[in-house]
């Protein structure tokens, strides 16, 4: 199988892009390694954010580890469930975790449920925990999406855009080669290539953009859960458009409707209005607080002008004990007493 990947419009040609490598006789898929690297960097960022917020870093580390394990299993189950037409004929392939076959939405769903249960048990706020965790999750997603590059996955329809990606037709599953791709096959050095949109790249850049947005907003959030809901709405918005372009998508059984397309639309439709409404309400509350504070300060200034403080009045002279002794008459030496004594 030809192992090259080309971006001719960008002047990039990778003659050898392996799917895996070996160390001491053990084979590791690059897809899995990149997901692991993204997860580790994401968890590192989460623990740093927890420390910045004065939270227990160990609690967040425990939560992320549990959620990660559950999300990996959940993403695989989700993928198998919506690809059952293939797996029911290949049951042994269900446990083949090395060659991809994971659904991100399944991982997010199961991972967030695990985090919610963890917060319930530890009696901590799920919304605050999610706010702290979601930038790290986005960082992990941005890195992990490059695993699709090495697996020749997550690509779109034929395109002649300058950043189009060329993949040997022999390197992808036959069911993912559309009629438009076959009509526009390119033969280079005797090798047939399909020319497609790099959806994995779009999503990686989108996740990076959302990551930067949340990092900029984390000091300015108005309420617990705001960053988390922006993450859900923002990711849903981007993923909705990417799913329209994507070829290798998961469909709702018996339909031609992509399950990720539906989930993305729901996330955006539900959480974006909530984000906007709660942000407007929070700003109104802040405005009311500022007005009340200004009114209080203005009234305080007015009272000072009408009723000056005692400290600003001229102080009365202090009568010291020695002054009392000087003023007080000497009874024993008074003239009246002298006459009586005489």
Q: Residue ranges of each PLM-predicted region?
A:
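A feature for loop-to-transmembrane-helix boundaries and adjacent hydrophobic helices
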Residues: 1-342
């Amino acid at each position: 199988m030809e192992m090259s990947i080309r971006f001719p419009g960008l002047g990039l040609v990778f003659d050898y892009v392996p799917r895996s490598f070996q160390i001491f006789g053990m084979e590791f898929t690059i897809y899995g390694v990149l997901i692991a690297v993204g997860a580790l960097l994401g968890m590192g960022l989460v623990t740093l954010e927890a420390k910045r917020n004065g939270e227990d870093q160990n609690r967040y580390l425990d939560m992320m580890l549990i959620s990660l394990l559950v999300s990996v299993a959940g993403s695989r189950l989700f993928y198998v469930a919506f690809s059952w037409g293939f797996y029911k004929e290949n049951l042994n392939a269900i446990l083949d975790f090395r060659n991809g076959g994971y659904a991100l939405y399944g991982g997010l769903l199961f991972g967030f449920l695990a985090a919610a249960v963890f917060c319930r048990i530890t009696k901590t706020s799920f919304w605050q925990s999610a706010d702290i965790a979601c930038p790290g999750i986005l960082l992990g997603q941005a890195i992990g999406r490059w695993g699709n590059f090495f697996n020749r996955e997550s690509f779109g329809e034929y395109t002649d855009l300058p950043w189009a990606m060329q993949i040997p037709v022999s390197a992808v599953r036959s069911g993912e080669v559309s009629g438009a791709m076959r009509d526009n096959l390119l033969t280079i050095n005797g090798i047939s290539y399909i020319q497609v949109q790099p959806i994995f790249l779009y999503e990686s850049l989108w996740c990076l953009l959302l990551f930067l947005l949340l990092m900029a907003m984390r000091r300015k959030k108005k309420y617990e859960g705001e960053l988390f809901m922006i993450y859900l709405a923002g990711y849903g918005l981007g993923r909705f458009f990417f799913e329209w372009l994507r070829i290798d998508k998961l469909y709702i059984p018996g339909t031609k409707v992509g399950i990720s397309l539906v989930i993305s639309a729901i996330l955006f439709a539900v959480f974006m209005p909530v984000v906007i409404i709660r942000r407007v309400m929070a700003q109104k509350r802040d405005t009311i607080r500022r007005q009340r504070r200004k009114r209080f300060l203005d009234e305080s200034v007015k009272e000072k002008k009408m009723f000056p403080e005692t400290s600003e009045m001229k102080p009365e002279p202090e009568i010291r004990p020695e002054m009392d002794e000087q003023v007080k008459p000497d009874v024993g030496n008074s003239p009246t007493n002298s006459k009586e004594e005489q």
